[in-house]
Amino acid sequence: MGARPVLVGFALLAAAPVLIVSMPAIGAQAGRAPANSTLTAVPGIKVGHHTLTERPTGCTVVLAEAGVTAGVDVRGSAPATRETDLLSPVNLVQIAHAIVLSGGSAFGLDSASGVMRYLEERRIGFEFGPAHVPIVPAAAIFDLSVGDGRIRPGADCGYQAARAATDSSVTEGSVGAGAGATLGKAGGMGRSMKGGVGSASITLPSGLIVAALVVVNAAGDVIDPANGQVVAGVRAADGKSFADARKMLRAGGPGGVIAPAGRQNTTLGVVATNARLTKTEATRVSQMAHDGYARALAPAHTPGDGDVIFTLATGERTGNTDAGQVGALAADVMAGAIVRAARQATGVPGFPALRDLK
């Protein structure tokens, strides 16, 4: 029997990946899971976080210092983004050197300036005389309701996150851009929970790697696609069980309308792969990866969301790659990363995490 795919948090039934985040991964060769099952499983990708001490907020930086093909799909109706137009397939620049995910809403986009400074100091970017101009798209979540909203990530936060970036397994939970992330706000902030950063990856016997990192700051619930059960989300009146946002949306009348706080949300994702993709194909992968949001978040892509997914393709794996295959796998690992974000989160005063409800 041939080598089996390595699915971190997944199992294969027939040809379709099924999310089973509670089960251990099965190694392709040695019968073990890979040492790194996060975004940095893709060679050439580094991730760093910086979390502010003054309040729960911060930023997360994905470095691709060599410059890699990049695409994006901004699916939410209320995005806070920077340089995403540059990643359109019809525009000139084909690569990015980093992606910044930040708290602080639109103010947090300043974090990208610090990452640009970090990269220019290392002569990374497009050279124009004495200057080097790195391409650093960014997106931010709304977390101003957690702690003192006057405290926001800025350029120094981005610089420190870039300095901290490594190719080691990504630290998950309530760190970096996920420090102030919350979920379950459809029932009001008083019934919400802590969100955060999650990551997952898949490696096929062919050597293809597809990985995802996500910052979950959702209005509703995180759903485990393996069983359709709520993992974390809107808490019921007892503060321990779940109200189920899907039932709330169908109830009508009192309790059937998303609370105003349910409009203060955004989920941000980055897909990375060692496949060789064009800019158009990377954009398509971003589009397909949003299926992972739809599987693991209820609801997703609402008028109050700024949902964004970036894709980085390093091209390290030579030969032809089906962008459709990469996109389908990206949706799977994105869903897995979302579930991990909920499970790895840690609570702060007023916002319990899943582990606090047990």
Language-model features: locations:
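Signal peptide processing junction and immediate N-terminal pro/mature segment
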Residues: 21-30
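Small-residue packing motifs within transmembrane alpha-helices
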Residues: 5-12, 333
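N-terminal secretory signal peptides that target proteins for export/translocation
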Residues: 1-3
